[in-house]
Amino acid sequence: MSGGASRKPGGTVEHLLHPCNFYGGGAFFIPETGISPKLKGEIFMVNIDDGITAMEVAKSLGMGLYKAACVCRIDGEVKDLRTPINKDCKLEILTFDDDDGKRALRHTASHVLAQAVKRLYPEAKLAIGPAIDNGFYYDFDVDVPFTPEVLEKIEAEMKKIVKEALPLERYELDPDEAIAMMEKKGEPYKVELIKEHAGKGEKISFFRQGEFDELCAGPHVPDTSRVKAFKLTSCTGAYWRGDSDNKMLQRIYGTAFTKKEDLDNYLHMLEEAKKRDHRKLGKELGLFTIMDEGPGFPFFLPNGMVLRNTLIDYWREVHKRYGYVEISTPM
């Protein structure tokens, strides 16, 4: 949903022009205007009070859009739905179908993961947890390994947090206050990140959900209940900030969707891809092996040589058919 607006003195916004992106489908009715927009991109006008949030705008357009909304875009900048509208602007309500909506929901899922880990393992130290292509991850400094059994335990706690529908509330602190808070919580990695930004003269932003406070610029979905379908997919080691001189952390990967059906389809796709993984097939079929002396270089086994020579013979036949001749250069 996007448009332009002009404000009256006294704090109202009138003539808000909205070409709507109804990603969720269906029609919505706006009582105060008598408008029932049905097509993506349809333009209509509404009046809203000065200071109303983007979430309230979405709700006024229909519960379908409100429930599907993840974040908004105000004059091209992605913001939380709790952001008040206090100026003439172009406003878009973004759902999971939008890339920015996906990133926001999956970023929120990483916060849910971190909160679950802190509930189960209070001694865990938090590093970073961004959204990435097709999912999210979070890095933890912990003494216990995150085994598959532990991941199942964490997932169960995440489901509890989602069910609690905890609102994500943004707030800001002065750098000194932010450092003091994270030091009190025993979060050295967060303190390091805050100190790097402290010299910019800007306040430090956090998001709070229940008892959990996270250093973060956002944006996020309104509450944890929006993370309806998720799965922790793997765990691996990762050096803090990608530097081998730093401590090795444990990175948990996951993905999240708004619908269980979409999650199931994605996980099925991953399983099918695993079946066709050349590393898996190479080992199972005895085609090649990888040795420590030559990482990344396949050493062909007898079965692999049969396949390799068959391909080379076919390559020679095709090239000969089209008039090519072979040459050889020094290796």
PLM ranges: what are they?
Residues 11, 30-31:
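Intrinsic disorder/low-complexity segments enriched in small, polar and charged residues
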Residues 4, 24-27, 41:
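Targeting/processing segments of secretory and organellar proteins
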Residues 83-104, 125-129, 137-331:
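Auxiliary tRNA-acceptor-end handling modules of aminoacyl-tRNA synthetases
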